């Protein structure tokens, strides 16, 4: 397994403390990797800064060609990437290969095309004898911090728009799941000029802090927890860096009496438990109107009970393990606290799976109240709660009564209601009669404590640029 860092076009061993990388399906150590030292972090940033002098001036065509080559290489090595992701994250291998790899390739190809569509405002005269134009230029060095739930996908979401816009990047994957990012570094080093892409390994305190706080870094992009986002914003405040934050969610799923219950059940069974629920847009907070509440709980409970947890390399496995032992304990604690309320009923699941690995049973909890922690706090595991509601006004207020604002969905056959409710929901995305669907052409991002900035789409590309005014006297 490729375990070296990429700094200034060279694969080098880390010079810091060694950290174990685990297989969450077994709990075994896959390998140990040495972190980047403080000197290596500095070298990576300075290499990116030096490379920016030329890369920032390349034509969109050149950047497009590089991104397309990288997309092709990822596609050609799709099986290798899927196997690494499966071993390091516990994802079902078939899901990693069939779902994630094509989407990752598409992200790079989309931004390869988008690079050639980015332009500033046409020139105009707003002062006599002067012509103004608006430019969209790259910022410089971008420090990108990727999470552990979708390591390669999130690396793609961060690298593709930053590079397409003409920036240089220093990427730090999670120390829990670094293997696909390090493999990507190996393949990318011969496609991009030295220093344009740098990939480090290490913990937040030892590598993340010196990286995001480096004076040469102009922007920090994070997908992670609210706590990590708060830390980075505070840590970088003195240098007034631009920050791009995607900080998790607790998606409300609003099911009205007239909804297609079978579609809801099928949707939540898939979208609430995909990736073992380790997804910031997971359909995890259901509000069911009282007329269909009992039916939905019964049918959804039966459906969730059929979900199969198992070995990642088993074609029939639908849920793999959680990412780490520490996260397994967090999920278990959240469910135990829900049970202790006395009014929340476990319909199915509600316990760790016996045996090796960090498995938690797919869980459905009914009778949750609006103020319960299981409704208000992100669990980030295979745990879905159901809360009954009376009417539209009540459920919209409840859905918005959350610190999160990333994703939501509305299930109804009433088109007017779908538009009305969608317009009032304080979430970056609202799906109607579906959930979880993402495409490269549309923006993904939140509001409130879920963060700000957009991934994917032309909006995502613009986030990695600075708007500049040039005025010419004539």
Swiss-Prot record:
SUPFAM superfamilies: ALDH-like (SSF53720). It is an enzyme of class 1 (oxidoreductase). Pathway: Amine and polyamine degradation; putrescine degradation; 4-aminobutanoate from 4-aminobutanal: step 1/1; Amino-acid degradation. It catalyses: 4-aminobutanal + NAD(+) + H2O = 4-aminobutanoate + NADH + 2 H(+); 5-aminopentanal + NAD(+) + H2O = 5-aminopentanoate + NADH + 2 H(+). One of its GO terms (biological process) is L-lysine catabolic process. Pfam families: Aldedh (PF00171). NAD(+) binds at residues 146-148, 172-175, 209, 225-228, 280. Belongs to the aldehyde dehydrogenase family. Gamma-aminobutyraldehyde dehydrogenase subfamily. Homotetramer. This is Gamma-aminobutyraldehyde dehydrogenase. It comes from Escherichia coli (strain 55989 / EAEC).
């Amino acid at each position: 397994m490729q375990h070296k860092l990429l700094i200034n076009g060279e694969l080098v061993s880390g010079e810091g403390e060694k950290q174990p990388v685990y297989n969450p399906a077994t709990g075994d150590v896959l390998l140990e990797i040495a972190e980047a030292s403080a000197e290596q972090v500095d070298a990576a940033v300075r290499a990116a800064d030096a490379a920016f002098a030329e890369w920032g001036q390349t034509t969109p065509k050149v950047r497009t060609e590089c991104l397309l080559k990288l997309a092709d290489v990822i596609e050609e090595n799709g099986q290798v990437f899927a196997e690494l992701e499966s071993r390091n994250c516990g994802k079902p291998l078939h899901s990693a290969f069939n779902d994630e790899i094509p989407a990752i390739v598409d992200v790079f190809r989309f931004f390869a095309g988008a690079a050639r569509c980015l332009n500033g405002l046409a020139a105009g005269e707003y002062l006599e004898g002067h012509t103004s134009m608006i430019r969209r230029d790259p910022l410089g060095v971008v420090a990108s911090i990727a999470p552990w739930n979708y390591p390669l996908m999130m690396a793609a979401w961060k690298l593709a728009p930053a590079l397409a816009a003409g920036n240089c990047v220093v990427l730090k994957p999670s120390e829990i799941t670094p293997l696909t990012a390090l493999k990507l570094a190996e393949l990318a080093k011969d496609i991009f000029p030295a220093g344009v892409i740098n990939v480090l390994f290490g913990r937040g305190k030892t590598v993340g802090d010196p990286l995001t706080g480096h004076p040469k870094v102009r922007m920090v992009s994070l997908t992670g927890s609210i706590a990590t986002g708060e830390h980075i914003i505070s840590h970088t405040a003195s240098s007034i860096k631009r920050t791009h934050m995607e900080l998790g969610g607790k998606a409300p799923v609003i099911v009205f009496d007239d909804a297609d219950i079978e579609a809801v059940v099928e949707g939540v069974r898939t979208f609430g438990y995909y990736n073992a629920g380790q997804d910031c847009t997971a359909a995890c907070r259901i509000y069911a109107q009282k007329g269909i509440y009992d039916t939905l709980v019964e049918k959804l409970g039966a459906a969730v009970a059929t979900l199969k947890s198992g070995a990642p390399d088993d074609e029939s496995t639908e849920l793999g393990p959680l990412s780490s032992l520490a996260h397994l304990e967090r999920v278990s604690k959240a469910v135990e606290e829900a049970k202790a309320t006395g009014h929340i009923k476990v319909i199915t699941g509600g316990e760790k799976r016996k045996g090796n690995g960090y498995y938690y049973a797919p869980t459905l909890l009914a009778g949750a109240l609006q103020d319960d922690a299981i409704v208000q706090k992100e669990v980030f595991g295979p745990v879905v709660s159901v809360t009954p509601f009376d009417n539209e006004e009540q459920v919209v207020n409840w859905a918005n009564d959350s610190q999160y604002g990333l994703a939501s969905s509305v299930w109804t056959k009433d088109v007017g209601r779908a538009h009305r409710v969608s317009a009032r929901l304080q979430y970056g995305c609202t799906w109607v009669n579906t959930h979880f669907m993402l495409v490269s052409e549309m923006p993904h991002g939140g509001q409130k404590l879920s963060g700000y900035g957009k991934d994917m789409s032309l909006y995502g590309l613009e986030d990695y640029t600075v708007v500049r005014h040039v005025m010419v006297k004539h």
